[in-house]
């Protein structure tokens, strides 16, 4: 282990001299596997745990999810932390916080207790995701980003598949309990974060990141897409899974099996989507995603209007998740239009924008859910249509000065 404890700094351009498993992209893959082991266990068990153990209703689950999104709204605080801690270290510390909070979740089966553990795990999750996006865009070249990000998504899905598969098998055949599942998922995430701290050097990017809040007018379309995506994502994360339990009575192993199918599909298709993104570009990829999501959410609405059954609902859940995996197209769009030194501060700002609606929307929609669950999905369909309109404003070849179709036309006219 002595050779693993070397924390020397390695310049990014010199990292190719390291063994492949110790290079920056390899670290991104390990972290991509570590995060879902805790988060996926938490997600898979949450709806059943809060209904069966904590006796939650739609209002409480809405409040819990709103509290969970507060650290995302405050992700801009990452910029302040980066004044005294490098991004790589902050990412690993955040993974430890996420894993530790998930590990102790079942010891606090009350509304108040779950608010506390959820807040801690959420700080870890959102700060990790903020830093992770920045590191991905700094460490992966523009040319390789679409396919590499596709493989990173597949790695995360594979880790989730393992976690979900063990939950299904353990619940059905070995009497797995909430306590053991949470301890195992959170504990492995902590262990992998410690491994990453010991095994990898500190990587030094030749382009220093700005340590201040960055808001640029020319990034407005990226900000708008982030806002709409955050609002829409909450409805899928909170209410689609909650519907499976409340309306169709899915048990732990059934709902987890559905998540398992989701991640299996992602493992197979995320690399393909990365290649498609490289071929068809961000505009066409995002148009495809949002058009598909508009149809999916409309059909969710139809479940309540026309009384359609569980098979359709489960199928939509899988398709829904598949479309959401295309979100890395927004990352590569920003990578193409941004100044290299803006990656870290803009990742923090973007996460805050992404979570503006996420803080209050679940709680408000929780009350709407009591009155009309179908209306929640009708609202989501409207958000997907709005995102579709925004994606049509992306030029075919986005770049600095050509961030939108309007800017691209001005550039062509000036030429």
Language-model regions, residue ranges each:
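Short amphipathic helix-loop junctions that connect adjacent transmembrane helices
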Residues: 44-59, 238-255
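C-terminal ends and interior cores of transmembrane alpha-helices
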Residues: 96-109, 292-306, 392
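Hydrophobic core of transmembrane alpha-helices in multi-pass small-molecule transporters
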Residues: 33, 101, 112-128, 310-325
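C-terminal membrane-cytosol helix-exit motif in multi-pass small-molecule transporters
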Residues: 167-168, 186-205, 390-395
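Intracellular juxtamembrane helix-capping segments at the cytosolic ends
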Residues: 127-140, 325-338
